Amino acid sequence: MNKRSFKLKIACVFLIVAMAGCTKLHEQVIDEVLGSSSASPQNALAAAYGQMDNGTFVNHAQAFALQEYSTNEAILPTRGSDWGDGGIYRAIHEFTWDGTNSMITNTWNSLNLGITESLTAINSVTQSNDPNKAQLLAEAKALLDLYTFHALDLFGQAPYRDPSTANAPLQVRKAATAIDSLITDVESLIPNLANIGQNNTGNGRFTKQAAYALLADMYLNRAVFKDRYASTFNFTEAAVDGNGTDMDKVITYTSQLIGSGQFKLESNFFHNFDIANANGTELIFVITQYVNTLTNSSNNFAYMPMERNQKPSPANRGTNASCITPEFYHTWDNNHNDPRFQRHYQYADGTWFMNDGTDVSVPVTTAVIGGTTLPWFHFNRGMQVGQQYGPSLSGSSDYQRTPDGRIKVNMLYCEKAPTQLMDFTPALNFDDPTQGVFTQLEINQGVRPFKFEFDPTGLNSRSNSAIPMYRLGGMYCMRAEAYLRKGQTTQALADVNALRTSRTREALYANAPGTALISIDMPTLYNETGYEMYWEMYRRKASIRFGTFEAAGTTKPVSQPFRRIYPIPQSTMDASKLFAQNDGY
């Protein structure tokens, strides 16, 4: 059974349930009373997994927004008549958010639903006689720890109810103390988790390898969790079990993955984010996605930065929303030959899409979209900067063609400002530098990261691309940071250079590998983690650890440490006396 088989099996269950008159298995499971044994263990576990792609980690306006738009990497400005929405997007980057921001509320609710569904799965599996009970129970508990970790990271606290006790009271876990309990729990689950690829598992299931990655993440951020508002963090504190320090544990767990032989760095960096990436050699734990099932999926990470007149097929377009900041773009200065910066697409007949004004046409390839065969235009990947080129529509179902039937490449203009060239400028020039608001004639601004491949079969909104939660490149970043915090500069440099030199450019540039560094320090490592992990919900935690989170930037003033976590939503505070509001809110 392949890596996605478990979720595919559950997708079939979804279909059967739908045909019987219930639209989603989620609805059935959510309605189960905690403590009931009526939910089948596999269905309950599927619901816990399913909450990951029910917006939580795949919608740009939930965890992604809080982890990315709050940093010096990404921004979603108001673009003329679009993306105002009461200022909810700008507030995250301008650090003016409060407990009424709907993205904060939705993220909190989604994580809490993940916690609830994990607790339901734990209870269901515990009461079952499933022959694979030990493994399923370990997976359910691991998902509970994963959702709780993210809630503690973003909000500093998380709800909990003991699933082993009938009518157990609702409790509140606090980050400073709960992080150690989470670490201990995940470590205790490892014996009962399957090795990846065994017992019908793959990278879409929580395996021993996913546990090692989560533990490395927990230990790397443990010092922050324990003293959130500190001016400096104690990264050398003794580990939970007393064996070594936090950074020693990061090295241990990442090394188990790096040295296992089960994973391999992709020479083409962007393969990690392709539509057909499910069997990627680098992927440790992913959110599996399908277009053609009743499970959820999202194309957001590709759709949001693409302009509305960039059309991967005549039936698709981008939405001209998010972009990277000038600060992040300029970290790439003198590093544009890095294979992770940009990659040109080559068509089967050898045509390269240069996107520089020299293109005349590209050959026609096809993608099946909505039961029809439509031409598919492949945009380049990575950072898209400067004047953009691509196809224009001829009618509603085809591109403009050259006399020999190829797709004509044109200079592009912004859809909602037809006289404005689609020039993705590195600079973001706002009339009021404290507010990210563009006029209608300024909506072109901002370099766009095309890290994830746009899936034209999903009609803009859905995708078959698996979303990496943990991958091997991230493990190298974590281990390099742990080495450097221990003063082991040689080892840190070796890990950074392993990432740099394993990635290669396209054949247009003779498949040249990235160049190695000759030295490393903390600012350099911070930039290197950005090159590797941009657009992957990594930046906020890294910025806090590296001490850059409070710095002023584009539309952002110098901020106070209380902004390192978000407020408990006002709707929750109004409805319950259980939670105490976080400091500063």
Annotate each predicted stretch with a short phrase:
Residues 22-70, 97, 569-585:
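Membrane-proximal, proline-rich intrinsically disordered regions
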Residues 129, 150-154, 159, 221-230, ...:
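Short coil/turn linking the two alpha-helices of tandem helical-hairpin repeats
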